[in-house]
């Protein structure tokens, strides 16, 4: 019994050490709903890729926020995306807290997925349920992709019994479609 307890303790300690830098390396922006971690990323590029003009929930250009730095603007922007996705899903969890990790490109995404899959898919972003973390490639980031993954995070935390994967994809796809339609970024027919 003592060997078992020691083995479990060592395994947990190793897991904690290994996970310490998994999503929380580098710089951080703290928002109300997300802690946003980034390495080798220009936050002005992040803001420009997410078209801040669209959001009803953000007021970064108000008199009070003109002196704000880019980190507070990014925090407000991601909070606004969360609120917009919540409105589309009609799921409002004001106590929600998640993590977003911005990787410079798909290589970072691939490296994380490689630790869990033998042949990881080539994706620009994904939501990792066990860590309540959205991973997104800055090179491929757009409002639709990020909204889709945030929808997965909301769906995952809202339902007591998580819906099947296909149902989650339909809901997240609807969010992405709604955002892209509202911003005029749907592909031409």
Predicted regions, residues:
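Acidic/histidine-rich, surface-exposed loop or edge segments in extracytoplasmic proteins
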Residues: 30-69, 154
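Short pre-active-site segment immediately N-terminal to the catalytic Zn-binding motif
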Residues: 128-147, 159-163
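Auxiliary, metal-adjacent structural segments of Zn-dependent hydrolase domains
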Residues: 24, 69-130, 184
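Sec/Tat signal peptide C-region and signal peptidase I cleavage site
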Residues: 19-23
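Bacterial N-terminal signal peptides
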Residues: 10-18
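Active-site recognition of the HExxH zinc-binding catalytic motif
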Residues: 144-157, 169, 173
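Bacterial N-terminal signal peptides that target proteins for export
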Residues: 1-9
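Post-HExxH zinc-binding segment in Zn-dependent metallohydrolases
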Residues: 162-189
């Amino acid at each position: 019994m003592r060997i078992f307890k020691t083995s479990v303790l060592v395994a947990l300690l190793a897991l904690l050490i290994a996970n310490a830098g998994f999503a929380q390396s580098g710089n951080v922006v703290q928002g109300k709903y997300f802690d946003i971690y980034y390495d080798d990323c220009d936050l002005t590029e992040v803001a420009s890729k997410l078209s801040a003009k669209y959001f009803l929930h953000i007021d970064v250009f108000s008199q009070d926020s003109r002196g704000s730095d880019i980190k507070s603007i990014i925090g407000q922007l991601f909070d606004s995306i969360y609120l917009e996705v919540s409105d589309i899903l009609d799921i409002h969890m004001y106590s929600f807290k998640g993590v977003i990790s911005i990787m410079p490109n798909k290589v970072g995404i691939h490296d994380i997925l490689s630790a869990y899959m033998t042949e990881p898919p080539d994706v620009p972003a994904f939501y990792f349920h066990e860590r309540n973390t959205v991973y997104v490639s800055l090179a491929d980031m757009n409002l639709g992709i990020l909204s889709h993954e945030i929808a997965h995070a909301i769906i995952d935390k809202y339902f007591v019994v998580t819906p099947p994967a296909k149902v989650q994809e339909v809901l997240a796809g609807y969010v992405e479609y709604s955002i892209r339609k509202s911003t005029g970024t749907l592909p031409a027919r």
